[in-house]
Amino acid sequence: MTMRAQLGQIKRRPMRTRAGVVILAATVLLAASQAASAAQKDRVRVLDQASREPVRGAFSMLERSDRGIETRLRTRARPGHAHSLWYVIFNSPENCSDGACGDDDIFIDPSDHSAGFNAPQIAATRASSVWGGAGAVANPAGRLKLEGALGVGEVPDGPGRLVIGRAADRALVPLGVVTGLEDPRGAVIIGVLQDHGAAHADPELLERQLTSFQGACNPVCEEIQFAVHVP
């Protein structure tokens, strides 16, 4: 092989290397972009409201994307009772008290809700509570399946579907500075299961049980289970 040929080969190698680097960089950027837009998923236990112990065999799955959130809840409850799913959303969880978002960020006294709402913390955490878009009647075995969803900036339409939010959105508790979901990837989402009592035979009353806060209680409504999803 002549020196001219060897020099020619030496000159061409950097060009191939640069092309390879460009392709590799493009691949890395594409992968990073796809990872950034990919949905985040997590699965947590469902806890009993009274005992704070896990409900046997129950779970809640949350999927986050830039567009909003979707949830799947599988649990056991009282057979024949109507239930609705609610989201308690902390859009600024870094401002939650004691480093964890909970009742003390909503109520003045978590052990006595009649003491009133903690308006400063609701504002600081940019908290909101809305219907999760799901309701169902537990089957004869007590099994309950709920699949909810909420988009960014979405305000649930219908009576009794917005609990904590802005006064302009006609929230039942008009103390919020925001309504619904602002940051689906960064918010703390607490799914709450409300029991409305025995399912009504009247379709209109049943619809209220499945879609509105404390709707058509038969005879009472109570929060029985919850699941905490931390980003």
Q: In which residue ranges do the predicted regions lie?
A:
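N-terminal secretory signal peptides that target proteins for export/translocation
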Residues: M1-R16
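Bacterial N-terminal signal peptides
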Residues: G20-A31
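Sec/Tat signal peptide C-region and signal peptidase I cleavage site
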Residues: Q34-A38
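N-terminal leader/targeting pre-sequences
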Residues: A39-P231
